């Protein structure tokens, strides 16, 4: 929605939604709703030829059993878009999780994907599907997105985690994490619709160089809350949910040079230290 609002009044906007309940809100925002479902390919016929530029941010469905690694949603979208005239450009919001664990190394877009989790495998499959469109002449740009945060986003800061007293790893066991403010991600999505080479991958990350525990400590200090306990990795398995443990198994530092140089994205919030503060407004680059 942030990217759409940034473009409002500049282009005609159409949003795909599977929920009829969202139609009034989309119309109120000046966006033409198209009710269809990526999980129901037969509903996608009206997508063909409807747009010259496409922003695809739908996550893969969680699938178990046969085909657990496939992203059928992106396959369905790509097939629908090929039914008539292709769009000029498509931007896909992937995840930095496709790199897997890099041992805290600095990661450029040229590093081979090495997904460790089912959701990351599905993102790799989605990237393959949009590259297929690229071979057909669409200017495809893939944004590999880390953790998205924003004080005005539901669950967009560690505040609730701090209130629950969820512990973090001690420094010697901790992992590097990567972040992007929701407003800066929206800016990157918008400019990528027009800028950048085709079949190009971009790390859509800010300039932070920070470990997970230090990020949570920073938030605690900013919000006047107690810093969390530090625990050893051996203790984490007994105290933390599996969803959080999976993020603690991967450490990497994203290099965002290509995004800033080729997309010419100017970050409103270069680090989490500035981004965790109350929001501010600035025009798109």
Task: Please report, for each region that a protein language model flagged, where it lies by residue.
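NAD(P)-cofactor binding segment of oxidoreductase domains
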Residues: 47-91, 128
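Conserved C-terminal active-site "lid" loop/helix of NAD(P)H-dependent oxidoreductases
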Residues: 237-266
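NAD(P)-dependent short-chain dehydrogenase/reductase
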Residues: 131-177
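Amphipathic terminal alpha-helices
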Residues: 270-285
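Conserved Rossmann-fold cofactor-binding substructure of NAD(P)-dependent oxidoreductases
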Residues: 27-52
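Mid/C-terminal beta-alpha module of Rossmann-like enzyme folds, strongest
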Residues: 186-191, 195-244
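Conserved Rossmann-fold NAD(P)-dependent oxidoreductase catalytic core, especially the SDR/UDP-sugar
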Residues: 75-118
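Catalytic helix-loop patch of NAD(P)-dependent Rossmann-fold dehydrogenases
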Residues: 103-142
């Amino acid at each position: 929605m942030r990217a759409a609002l940034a473009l409002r009044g500049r282009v005609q906007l159409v949003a795909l939604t599977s929920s009829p309940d969202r139609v009034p809100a989309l119309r109120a925002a000046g966006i033409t709703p198209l009710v269809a479902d990526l999980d129901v390919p037969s509903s996608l016929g009206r997508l063909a030829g409807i747009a010259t530029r496409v922003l695809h941010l739908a996550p893969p469905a969680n699938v178990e059993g046969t085909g657990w690694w496939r992203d059928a949603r992106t396959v369905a979208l790509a097939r629908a878009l090929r039914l008539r005239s292709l769009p000029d450009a498509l931007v896909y919001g992937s995840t930095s999780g496709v790199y897997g664990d890099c041992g805290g190394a600095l990661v450029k877009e040229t590093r081979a994907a090495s997904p460790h989790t089912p959701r990351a495998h599905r993102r790799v499959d989605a990237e393959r599907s949009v590259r297929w469109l690229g071979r057909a002449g669409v200017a495809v740009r893939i944004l590999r997105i880390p953790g998205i945060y924003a004080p005005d986003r539901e669950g967009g800061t560690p505040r609730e985690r701090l209130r629950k007293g969820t512990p973090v790893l001690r420094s010697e066991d901790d992992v590097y994490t990567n972040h992007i403010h929701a407003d800066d991600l929206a800016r990157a999505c918008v400019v990528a619709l027009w800028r950048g080479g085709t079949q190009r991958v971009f790390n859509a990350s800010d300039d932070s160089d920070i470990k997970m525990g230090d990020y949570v400590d920073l938030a605690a200090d900013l919000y006047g809350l107690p810093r969390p306990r530090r625990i050893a990795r051996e203790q984490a398995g007994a105290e933390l949910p599996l969803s959080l443990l999976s993020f603690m198994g991967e450490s990497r530092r994203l290099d965002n040079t290509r995004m800033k140089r080729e997309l010419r994205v100017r970050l409103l919030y270069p680090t989490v230290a500035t981004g965790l503060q109350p929001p501010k407004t600035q025009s798109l680059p």
